[in-house]
Amino acid sequence: MAKLSLRPQQSGSQPLALPPTQRFLPALLLLFVGSGCAALIYEIVWFQLIELVIGSSAISLGVLLGTFMGGMCLGSLLLPRFVSPARHPLRVYAALEAAIGALGLIVLVVVPLMGSIYTATPVQGLAGILWRGVLCAVCLLPPTLLMGATLPAIARWVEATPTGVSWLGFFYGSNIAGAVFGCVLAGFYLLRVFDMTVTTFVAAAVNFGVAGVGLALSRRAPHRPAIPRPAVEAERSAAGINAIYVAIGLSGLSALGAEVVWTRLLSLMLGASVYTFSIILAVFLVALGAGSSAGAYIARSSRPRTALAWSQLLLTLGVAWAAFMIARALPFWPINPSLSPSPWITFQLDVVRVAVAVFPAAVLWGASFPLALAAVVGPSDDAGRLVGRVYAANTVGAILGSALFSVVVVPHWGTRHGEQLLIAISLASAMVVFAAVRRARAVEATNERDAQRSSGWVPRPAGTLLAVAGAAAAIACVIAVPNVPDGLVAYGRFLPTYTNQPKYLYVGEGINSSIAVSEEPSGVRNFHVAGKVEASSLPQDMRLQ
């Protein structure tokens, strides 16, 4: 069987031959790098292209992101239902990539037509938001459905065991690595030097290249579908599996919620530009990829559920670390941007500051996905269906997190309460998994009480005490989350150059931006928007305003 398995094969005196999948593993990793690169190029181009139709407000961006991720979620669920496991996974993957490239080119033609339809039917309020969603669905759902189906398709190329499924974490990590490259390539080179049409052609060429390589590999590695095994799931209760789905959904919710909150705060510090967004996204994706690779390695252990629970609990500290660094440390680094001889020098400093803040938490979010896969795996499972469910749960959480934090939490509660909510969500996710682990160990203890202590990471009493201590630390982190400095809202990245701070009469955070009103000792009042002075009561400004 052409499947990924690390179990030795008995072959007498003949040398052991590597299974085809293991032999082609480097090529498969490269395929996922190319797939991720093309996907992020499309995402950046489509966002800019469709914003010309429905606008660039926070609500429009939320609709765009929700449609994009919703399509990927549906694709991950639908492929296992409509594509038989008997089909060669690599051929299915190649067909998906070729179709993505073709649809990517079609979007260039369809979007201008959607623009004429949108402007001809002006609709306001909730109906207008729904109308924008319909237009986004028409443009983005077909290609994003196929994008979401790629990982479940290739998942059938591995065995449904913790060791086999752990390789999916490496595939996921390589896909994210390609996404980082695509993000940087599109944001800093292709769109700057060329235009959206040329950039789309590059992404489509990558898709077609990946499809060609995948098809060639499928001819050299024949596939025989897995033989269904009797279900031996007594120890894997439905409640325990559902707990993993809930936890990975909450993990996706907190990850995208944090990206919304931290993008708002870091944009104050680094400046609101496409380069800042690309830097934040690239650093976040690098950390996710590193975490996914680490999680894939850890997933081979006998306790992936325990590892998942601890990763979620450690996220409470990671979010608290980012909140502290963004509010109390990074804005006050003695850096004067006006002294930089080149924007590229400033970009290097920005990368360092973003990494210091978000890297720890993003690594833990990246590790959670392969750990969740290994936590629900069973010998009788269809690997494609398994990956589809976990991926869908994570994506649904991500969609909810993006919408909830961008439309409700930040505008109405503020970024500080948003970060507190993120810590609480991570704590809840950890407690859900810890409860499932405890129930499973209680069942094991009835049959093999001694094995339970020797095979776990730590004895049960010590593990319980550590979990309680971690929960207490998380609650302390919720209370200790600091407020955003008023000076950061007022002066942004130039805050270190203002040694004498004015009196702040008002500071607020809205759905699109953060604003402040300050009064200097001389009585002059300034109106600040997103770290810049937009108006003042000085006579020379009053004549121009």
Question: What kind of feature is each model-predicted range?
Answer:
Residues A2-Q545:
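Alpha-helical transmembrane segments of multi-pass membrane proteins
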